[in-house]
Amino acid sequence: MKRIFYTLGLLLLCLPMLQAGPVTRSKAEQTAKNFFAKRQPTLSSSTASLRMDFVYKAAEREEALFFVFNRGEKDGFLLVAADDRFPEVIGYAFKGHFDAARMPDNLRGWLKGYEREMLAVMDGKAEPIDPIREAKPTRDLPSSIAPILETGEHASDPILWDQGYPFNTLHPLLPSGQQAYTGCVATAMGQIMRHYKWPEKASGEYDYYDDMTGTHTHYSGTFGETYNWSKMPGNISVGISPEEVKALSTFMRDVSFSVNMQFADFGSGTFSIFVERALRETFHYKKSLRYIHRSLLPGKEWKDMIRKELAENRPVYYAGADGSMGHAFVCDGYEPDGTFHFNWGWGGMSNGNFYLNLLNPGSLGTGAGDGGYSTDQEVVIGIEPASNEAPGIVPDPTITLYGLQHNMSDEALDLSVKIKNYSTYAGDVKLAYRLTLPNGTETTNPAVTVPIVWEDIIGESTGNITIPCSQFAEGKNTISILYRTDGMADWKELKHILMGLVNKIEVTMPAGDVAYSVADARIVLKDGSLSHNLKAYSDCKLSATVYNPGTEEFRSRVTFALRNTEGRLYFLGRHLVELHPGDEDGEKVSLTITGLKARAGQYMLVCTGDMELLMEDASWIELASIEVAEHTSTHSSLLVASNPQIDLLTVHRANPETLPTFSITNEGGATFSGKIEIVAIKAFSETFFQAKEEHMSLAQGETKVLSPELTANSSLYTNAELFPDGIYYIVIREQGFWDPIDLFGDYYYRIRLITDLSSSXIAGKDVSTIVLYPNPAHDYVHVAIPPTYAGSTLRLFDIQGRMQLSTKIRICRYASRRRTSSEGHLYRCGRRHGREALYSLIQSVNSKTDKGNAGWEIPSGHCPCTVC
């Protein structure tokens, strides 16, 4: 959840590709005239006083994004898109004025979001919304709702509050001598409460510290002053009376303190989750109101929910963030064209109708660093006064699945379940699992209880669940993770918050294969929709329509790639896919690929929703066979790499074997001369060390070989703190003028770097207690266990409490390979040599020669059992 500030606004999102052209000024002016003439034909100034006052351009580009037209002095404004791929009109108002020099900061942020979205479309990285689909009505609801805070009972005195005088006269005086602003969160809350003129007075206390300016200021007090609603005008005039100033500032002081407002000269901010608590407990609104995060709902369901609230005459508290900061405001109306009316909390300035986003649902997760913005929106709904007869019922806490890891052994499936709290609940969360056998039999099994909190940031916790393999039947077994909190009568399924509704785990027996699924949600390529110009080593584009033939929603950040017959993967791009069940229209996915790494040839187009795994460890869905054409570059050098290593290779730090070499071929039309380097890059990190550097000259068609040397920089390679054991990418690249440039083709392979067991502190034969090395460990650990522990269960947890390994300790007669996770394997050896000992080692083998009863071969000299 993002902290909301006075001076920073909401940024919407960036996304996918089309062909179109710019809109001229004259055409934009005609669009504006037609719009006002159609929507308000009786207004005399509809077209006569229309003028273009501002052209919005991208900060570092000269392209116009939209034109701003004002009508008369204060008869409304219009934002007309300067590119015909977008809706003609992207924002408008029938009263007021748009002043580019004095626009509210939150509107400025909103338009900055529009800018990023529009540039993404114009650059072929995103697709715009379809205005026809946006305008589809919500069943059983009015086609439009006039702005609640400005019409109806408020028509003669619209609610147009601000954050400065007279609302902040009782707010803290800052060290600079400036009176603190009320803050956008408090202003949005205050306007909604002014709509109801409720409560008579607040109750309870406030007690918190303000660390915004580093002064650690303590604020505490008791609520209880009676509010003089009759002296709180909606529209503040110049001649406001002292009584009105006191009434407004008393109320807004309480609102700010109720949400633990943090004050500073540049603005005041707090968390939206405090709004739910304050309205319910301090200001006596119905207990049934609730905070909801955008990522919990599909796009259409989100908009339908907001429309339903407004149809019930309930304004919606709305907030959004751009990845760092954001702004809160009030959504109080909607129109048939798919736009919503926003009151920015800036004295009425620029209040109007805007789209929630300009990008289709699948584009909403594509932002800077694939972060996205629109999905970081929040609302509080169900805001209405409580009464003794109808106080409302506190909704069940919203607990979500935030992360899931598993370990499958012969004895049990161990699950590490990370949960996140999107409510004001604080207490115990009970976790259970529902097991559905292949024959349909279901059982619900309580498993573990974990505590969770919510203060300031959303609380997180981790629970570990062990499911004995004896509970599984032959075939596909399905597991759902359930939760229940104090006061909940029934178990609820955990829904995944990370852009996907992953809530099922499938275990196939007797193989022991484990897969995650999205219930009955699938992603399938629509026949005839695939279009591309894929060419080896070139910039290219791909578009396709995917749909969901299942019965449940599919929403996940999907990675698309090419896979060759060897199993090598070539990354294409990522796209947030939001698919309604059974909707054969599906969603168009557009990808822009810069410098495709793949060679010419036949590939399989694949995708995966596994967000927390390395590409090589993910489960891939096959979509279609696809051909990559030959490259046609002849004017410059073009370096293509190849290497023989496909599988993960285990490398021992103390005695590293020779690593596979890279072949580099110049397939371009000119001689190459420059530096080539090989580096080892830590997975999930930017940490790397150099394993080779060489100045190389390659004529057209010439091939040379370069071999990595891990010990080339021994001071780094041997530093286990800087470069801990774990997975590394061995990458060959050109040292560019500014940044290194990865070669084309097969420019990397993976190794697992481990500290050699034979040189560690646990290599001796007389192990009398459990020993781990290294300790602390990062990605990899050796465990030495004396035979007296045979029959016990070994479990390893990381520092965050997540289970990484669970296995029964046994003395066996041969070395065996057992899958423990997507990261590696467990090797056990209990050969007798006068003394029994057991050593457990998680690693991948680089030799799979069949040895009969010995199972998978353990690399020579590195048997985990050092007494062998």
From Swiss-Prot:
Organism this protein belongs to: Porphyromonas gingivalis (Bacteroides gingivalis)
Lineage: Bacteria, Pseudomonadati, Bacteroidota, Bacteroidia, Bacteroidales
Annotated InterPro entries: Papain-like_cys_pep_sf, Peptidase_C10, Spi_Prtas-inh, Streptopain_sf
Source superkingdom: Bacteria
Transmembrane region(s): none
Stretch forming the signal peptide: 1-27
EC number: 3.4.22.-
Any Pfam family: Peptidase_C10
BP GO annotations: proteolysis
Keywords: Hemagglutinin, Hydrolase, Protease, Signal, Thiol protease
SS bonds (residue pairs): none
Listed name of the protein: Thiol protease/hemagglutinin PrtT
GO molecular function: cysteine-type peptidase activity
